Amino acid sequence: VRNEIRYADLAGRPSRVIAGALATVLGFLMTLMMSPPAQACPICSGTAPKLTLLQKLINADRAVIARPLGGGDFEVLEAIKSSPKEDDRRGTRLRKPKFVPGEDVPTRADAPSVLLLRQSIGGAWVVAGQMPSSAAPAARLLVGGKRSTDMTLADWQARVVTLAPLLEHPVAVLAETAYGEIARSPYAAMRSARDRVKPADLRTWLADPGRAPRRPLYWLLYGINAGPVEARDIAARVDALGRSNGLTDLSSLLAADLEAGGSARRVVLRKRYFEDRSRTLPELQEAVLAFTVHADAGDAALRRDTAAMFGGMVRTHRALGGLVAADLARWQYWEAVPDYIALLRSRALHPVMRQPVLDYLTASGRPDALAAVAASEALRRTGSAAVIPTAALLSGRIP
């Protein structure tokens, strides 16, 4: 086995392991570059369902809780969203409504009641899920919502306040909607859930293997709702991960630790992840994500402090300095320009990190930065290649 890989070789036919590692890094960089402050928190937004009941209600002109009568008819039990032209009073009979092809429509008269939505365009009905009539008040809370793309931070905060009590609601479609909408909200809006979710409930949900996909959000909410006991619990978990180079829920736990532990824990985590050269690439990715989320949700002073810390990472973890380039450019922190110029000239930069660094230097507009970009591009065109150890690349422990 060759003990070295030339950067140029990676553009040819890399092994599956290397290809997977590079794809992971590229995905991480795209997440950072495409997640402006007012948008979804990147720690857990990827786990949210693409289309929640709230979003479906925006596209519906009628929504009713109804029970099947057999023969294709339904009886309205509760109106959730009504059309002025229709009679959706309790007891109204829906005679053989037309459903979207492929819908799982209950036909037996003894089947549970369901929430039916009629689409504004086309007029066909869809089955949103089982729902008892007793859930009507909660379902009505979802009516009148805005599309995510039209929402301000204040809108998101109001949505979190409304939906936090519906987390893990016994009606599955309501629980999924509450989770999905809060998971895709900005972190600054998630803070509106403080004192609206009990830490004891969050501990129960976090301990349930069946809810594992929802843990990233629930760790964030645990930190937001933490008292002294919860803060110590979070810190102990983060410290255990630090000792073992663990990655399980790391970004969400780090963010929770920053929220619950304040400035003292920030100092600890800063030293552990950004000043320790032995940290792996996956650990650094998770730490950058957590600190970025907090910086974007904080004030200018916090962003400045985070930017300075990230600037130091360019010197401490030279090959991976590109991890923070997009954030530094977004925050217009140009003090790292000399370090990035030196990094390009040394050719120690990992090739996957190269483009974000070039983009950062170009965005700075500084003559020395633009000259370095031009020189780097000229060098690349000559086919010159730097060398990195294979073992370092595969382990993630790149100096």
Language-model region placement:
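Amphipathic alpha-helical scaffolding segments comprising HEAT/armadillo-like alpha-solenoid repeats
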Residues: 156-164, 188-204, 227-240, 262-274, ...
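Transition segments tied to proteolytic processing and entry into folded domains
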Residues: 36-165, 170, 174, 183
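Long, internal scaffold/assembly segments composed of regular secondary structure
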Residues: 207-208, 218-244, 255
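Eukaryotic acidic, Ser/Thr-rich intrinsically disordered low-complexity regions
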Residues: 353-399
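Structural detector for internal amphipathic alpha-helices that build alpha-solenoid repeat scaffolds
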Residues: 142-153, 176-192, 213-227, 248-261, ...
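Solenoid-like repeat scaffolds
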Residues: 167-168, 204-210, 237-246, 271-281, ...
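Bacterial N-terminal signal peptides
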Residues: 19-35
